[in-house]
Amino acid sequence: MQNYENTYRRLLLYADSMKIIDTHEHLQPNQNYLGDQPDVLCDYLSHYITTDLMSAGMSGEDLEKVKDYKTDILKRFKILEPYLESVKNTSYYRALEIGAKKIHKINEISVRTIEELNEKFKKAAICEDYGRNIMKNLCNIEVSINDNWSQDMKFSTTDLFVPTCQFSPDGNLSENLTFDEYCENYRQYFLKQKNDGMKTIKNVMAYWRTLYVEDVDYNTAKDLYTEVLKNKIDFPRKLEDYMLHVLLKIADENNFVIQIHTGLQEGMGNNLENSNPMLLRNLFNKYQNLSFDIFHMGYPYERELIVLAKTYANVYIDLCWAHIISPVAARNAFYEMLDVLPYTKILGFGGDYCFFDGVVGHITMAKQDICEVLAKKICSGECDIDLAEKILQAVLHDNAKRVFKL
């Protein structure tokens, strides 16, 4: 029987030596997210851990005070400290602590260290190659699929990134456009993005509505479009549904991969039922030649998603965000995926961060999760080291390269 610790360490060393393809980020140019000057609290509290802090009782008003970089950082940290202490058990916090340690050589985030951490962060973040050094040298990432929440693809079209953009059904509305012209403009927009290097289109509509999409006929959609322009109303759901089908046909014709947010939504008080991946079955059936990259392992609907990926050849499971939502859930789901699915259906890592330090923590946790599961499978006799290394190479690199045609 294999020794678990030795096996785990061997796999981890192998993972550390590999180039990794990062399936999903929201990374920004430094000047976009650092504002007037770099500040580690503004950066680290830009998302994710803020949900834990607010869950622990922190008010939005106090959060804004903590992120006011013009105020002394010790004063701000004293507001943050009681809430931060109560979330130090969470995976979101752990990712930040790992990033602070690996990048800035600070072992904890505390009142004792915050000034030094901030000074080191500020000094590093103003360097032009800050992000490149993190992604290429610390993380060994070959390329990332990047949604920087911008219609300007320039930042995301470099050797660091491949751009993606979000489905927006009501973009570029104009009273001067007929419905047919509007649909054609939609098509031309995505063709332009394809020429700029885009490989995927991202659907995040589970944040505001159900993932279920009906079939809507042309005349109904055209009448609704006319009503929207005439009465200045929001896009009705049926018109959104029609435009999503337009998008999926464009994607099918142009070999785009559709990335879909499922499961847990970032932030407070969202409707989780909107995001169950089972709501997508009719699309998987209708567009069988189109590849669907289903995000966040569907958590907490990961078992439903595993079954979908098993029974639909065009459905892939993406563990982006998953390892910092819950490493335990990610490990359990990955173990089960390997029991149920071809390993070629699994995409193992996407940082899903808007700042670079977070990626370091997340990729560290992801490699630990994946290697722990594979080591357990080796030690239980379910696979040998050669197969485990093939799986590791596939889920962290080769599968994404093939699916996204990189």
Can you annotate each of these PLM segments?
Residues 1-21, 43-102, 343-345, 360-406:
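Mid-to-C-terminal alpha-helical segments outside catalytic/metal-binding sites
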Residues 19-32, 258-265:
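Histidine-centered catalytic micro-motifs
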Residues 20-22, 141-145, 160-164, 198-202, ...:
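Structural preference for beta-strand elements that scaffold enzyme active sites
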Residues 199-304:
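Divalent metal-binding pocket/active-site signature
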